[in-house]
Design a protein with these regions (language model features):
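Predominantly the C-terminal beta-signal and adjacent terminal strand-loop region
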Residues: 114-147, 152
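Membrane-embedded beta-strand positions in outer-membrane beta-barrel channels/transporters
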Residues: 42, 53-55, 94, 104-108, ...
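Transmembrane beta-barrel strands of outer-membrane/channel proteins
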Residues: 9-13, 68-72, 121-125
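Residues that define the transmembrane beta-barrel architecture of outer-membrane proteins
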Residues: 3, 48-52, 99-105, 139-145
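Outer-membrane beta-barrel translocator domains and adjoining extracellular loop/strand segments
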Residues: 19-27, 79-85, 131-138
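Residue-level signature of outer-membrane beta-barrel architecture
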Residues: 1, 11-13, 58, 111, ...
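Extracellular loop and loop/strand-boundary signature of outer-membrane beta-barrel proteins
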Residues: 38-42, 90-95, 131-137
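Repeated loop/turn-to-beta-strand initiation elements of outer-membrane beta-barrel proteins
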Residues: 4-7, 63-66, 111, 115-121
Length: 153
């Protein structure tokens, strides 16, 4: 890994259903989707979503890579729900027309231990937006840490 810094911005848009009453399902369906669609510590799937996430990545040491980002999330269609990674409804629309789903600051550290072995940790904190508050009364924030080790042949 090279030492240095990098700034990046991600903008993802995945369609949502514009009219739940018609027979056309317009919600984006990522067939065989990965749980890491928009990060290794992901709460929601890529259906009916808009994500804007600036991130800074730097290498404080030769085998160490750290990144910090702040993701902002909106619903692409106010007539559609929020979906989990396999595509199931997590937060139904319930007639709520707010788009703002929330924001999630996150930090990730990757450490290359040997040529084949690496260790990783990702920390995320989720703030609920107006949509969750009005749709299901979710006013509490959520945080979690996901550590893992990778061995590559």
């Amino acid at each position: 890994m090279r030492r240095g810094r990098r700034a990046s911005v991600v903008l993802d848009v995945a369609s949502g259903d514009q009219n739940p009453a018609d027979p056309n399902l317009e919600t984006f369906n990522a067939l065989f989707q990965s749980g890491t669609y928009s990060g290794r510590a992901q709460l929601l799937g890529p259906s009916n979503s808009i994500r804007f996430e600036p991130t800074v990545t730097f290498a404080p040491a030769r085998q160490l890579l750290a990144s910090a980002g702040f993701g902002f999330y909106w619903r692409q269609s106010v007539f559609d729900a929020l979906y989990g990674i396999p595509g199931q409804v997590v937060v139904p629309s319930n007639g709520v027309t707010d788009r703002y789903e929330g924001c999630r600051p996150n930090v990730q550290i990757d450490w290359q231990l040997t040529r084949h072995l690496s260790a990783h940790v990702n920390c995320i904190y989720a703030f609920n937006g107006r949509f969750e508050e009005r749709s299901v009364g979710a006013t509490r924030t959520m945080s979690y840490v996901s550590p893992w080790v990778t061995y590559r042949f």
